[in-house]
């Protein structure tokens, strides 16, 4: 929009300047032609006046004035020829004035031709092509753009939005961390001795353990090795694993049996089964059952284990 308006203003300004130049040129030419037309008449009038003045001055200089008759006293006896002599002299004397008084031949006057007025031919307006922008010396005043009038937009009131029923989310109750514990007991050889590997492996298998994950033995719910693991058996020597291809040709100071609580099923019943398996292995290899501190197992320690199991069960109930 701004570019179109600016282009229109430039075209209108160029046409106006061109019209002013044409009008000024035509006016000056008309005035100049009228001056040349009046100048010969003035010259002729001035020449005529000058000729009249010259004639008057010549007549004055030559002494042409009023004709006066003077009486001439002639002597008696003078012949007729004597009287004609002065007349001739007088005629000869007055001849120059008459000759000078003759009108001078006037210069041929120039024939004045009627000055023809220049016929104004109708100007056929040619289709104006878009001219190149003319560099005007006058500063172009900035075109004030019409300020947009603020339009009052009538907004229709939005339909009332019915509040959606707020569904109160149930408070998330953080579950307390599950309490866990590990029950540990050991079967070890007597002081200064070690358990025989072959005898130990036979007693472990008789107690229902199966070799499995982590290269240790596990006691499953079923003696044939099916079902979840209830407790496990590891070597007392680090890293606590057994050789999968062991042939019984090894010695060890003992084994460790451990159960994680809570576990599958009844933890107290699983604890009794673990204690029976430890006593069976100890009887077979000639060892003894120790607690988690590798001390002799006592009834007080057994009750402590049972209390720990009950506490975990109640905490997780």
Swiss-Prot record:
GO terms for cellular component: cell division site; plasma membrane. It is a single-pass type I membrane protein. One of its GO terms (biological process) is FtsZ-dependent cytokinesis. Residues 90-156 have a biased composition (Low complexity). It is found in: Cell inner membrane. Residues 37-174 are annotated as: Disordered. It comes from the Bacteria. Residues 28-317 are cytoplasmic. SUPFAM superfamilies: Cell-division protein ZipA, C-terminal domain. InterPro entries: Cell_div_ZipA, ZipA_FtsZ-bd_C, ZipA_FtsZ-bd_C_sf. This is Cell division protein ZipA. It comes from Enterobacter sp. (strain 638).
């Amino acid at each position: 929009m701004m570019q179109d308006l600016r282009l229109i203003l430039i075209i209108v300004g160029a046409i106006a300047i061109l019209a002013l130049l044409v009008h000024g040129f035509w006016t000056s030419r008309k005035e100049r032609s009228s001056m040349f037309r009046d100048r010969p008449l003035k010259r002729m009038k001035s020449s005529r006046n000058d000729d009249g003045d010259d004639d008057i001055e010549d007549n004055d200089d030559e002494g042409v004035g009023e004709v006066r008759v003077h009486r001439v006293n002639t002597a008696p006896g003078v012949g007729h020829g004597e009287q004609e002599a002065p007349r001739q002299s007088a005629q000869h004397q007055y001849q120059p004035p008459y000759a000078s008084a003759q009108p001078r031949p006037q210069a041929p006057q120039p024939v004045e031709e009627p000055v023809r007025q220049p016929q104004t031919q109708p100007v056929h307006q040619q289709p104006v092509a878009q001219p190149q922008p003319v560099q005007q010396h006058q500063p172009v005043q900035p075109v004030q753009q019409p300020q947009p009038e603020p339009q009052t937009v009538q907004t229709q009131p939005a339909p009332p939005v019915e509040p959606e029923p707020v569904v109160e989310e149930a408070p998330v109750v953080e579950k307390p961390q599950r309490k866990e514990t590990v029950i540990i007991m050991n079967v070890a050889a007597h002081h200064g001795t070690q358990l025989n590997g072959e005898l130990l492996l036979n007693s472990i298998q008789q107690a229902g353990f199966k070799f499995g994950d982590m290269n240790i033995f596990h006691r499953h719910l079923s003696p044939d090795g099916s079902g979840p693991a209830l407790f496990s058996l590891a070597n007392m020597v680090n890293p606590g694993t057994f050789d999968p291809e062991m042939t019984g040709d090894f010695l060890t100071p003992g084994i460790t049996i451990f159960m994680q609580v809570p576990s599958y099923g009844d933890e107290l019943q699983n604890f009794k089964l673990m204690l029976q398996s430890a006593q069976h292995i100890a009887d077979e290899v000639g060892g003894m059952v120790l607690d988690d501190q590798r001390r002799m197992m006592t009834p007080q320690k057994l009750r402590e284990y049972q209390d720990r199991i009950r506490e975990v069960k109640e905490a997780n109930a």
